[in-house]
Amino acid sequence: MKNVTDSFVSLGHWPSAGSFGFNTDILATNLINLSVVLGVLIFFGKGVLSDLLDNRKQRILNTIRNSEELREGAIEQLEKARARLRKIEIEADEFRVNGYSEIEREKLNLIDSTYKTLEQLENYKNETINFEQQKASNQVRQRVFQQALQGALGTLNSCLNNELHLRTISANIGILAAMKQITD
């Protein structure tokens, strides 16, 4: 670095030849060069710079406008979605209420059906019991009748002898003959 500054210092020892020469004062030359460059840039670059800034401004404004439009569209879609959600919630509540009432109706129908079935089974049971009681009563009657008949036959057989038996048969034959004559 020291060599670079020494070379600039050695340039300062050259003799100046009239009005043109090297200005070795770095600070003075930089300021002059900078002011010339800035002046040229401002004079010629003013239009380009303003065009660039205008283009950039338009792009920013377009981006803002697009963002606003997208935001408004998103808000609109959000409102539509909220409206659909409210509608669906209302329908879901209606389905839930209808479903509960339908379930309640089905439950009552099932209970009624069960009671009817139980009543029918109770009636069948009572009919079966009555039938079995009648059957048992008939069997008891038949048994009593058979025993009474056997007892009567036993009594008759023990009381009847052959002679009494023959007279009873003859009397019955006479009755049958008389009935035959009446019918002829």
From Swiss-Prot:
The keyword RNA-binding does not apply. CDD domains: ATP-synt_Fo_b. One of its GO terms (cellular component) is chloroplast thylakoid membrane. Its main location: plastid. PANTHER family: ATP SYNTHASE SUBUNIT B, CHLOROPLASTIC. InterPro entries: ATP_synth_b/b'su_bac/chlpt. F(1)F(0) ATP synthase produces ATP from ADP in the presence of a proton or sodium gradient. F-type ATPases consist of two structural domains, F(1) containing the extramembraneous catalytic core and F(0) containing the membrane proton channel, linked together by a central stalk and a peripheral stalk. During catalysis, ATP synthesis in the catalytic domain of F(1) is coupled via a rotary mechanism of the central stalk subunits to proton translocation. Keywords: ATP synthesis, CF(0), Chloroplast, Hydrogen ion transport, Ion transport, Membrane, Plastid, Thylakoid, Transmembrane, Transmembrane helix, Transport. The chain crosses the membrane at residues 27-49. Pfam families: ATP-synt_B. It comes from the Eukaryota. It is a single-pass membrane protein. GO terms for molecular function: proton-transporting ATP synthase activity, rotational mechanism. This is ATP synthase subunit b, chloroplastic. HAMAP family: ATP_synth_b_bprime. In plastids the F-type ATPase is also known as CF(1)CF(0). It is found in: Plastid, Chloroplast thylakoid membrane. F-type ATPases have 2 components, F(1) - the catalytic core - and F(0) - the membrane proton channel. F(1) has five subunits: alpha(3), beta(3), gamma(1), delta(1), epsilon(1). F(0) has four main subunits: a(1), b(1), b'(1) and c(10-14). The alpha and beta chains form an alternating ring which encloses part of the gamma chain. F(1) is attached to F(0) by a central stalk formed by the gamma and epsilon chains, while a peripheral stalk is formed by the delta, b and b' chains. The lineage of its organism: Eukaryota, Viridiplantae, Streptophyta, Embryophyta, Tracheophyta. Belongs to the ATPase B chain family. The gene is atpF.
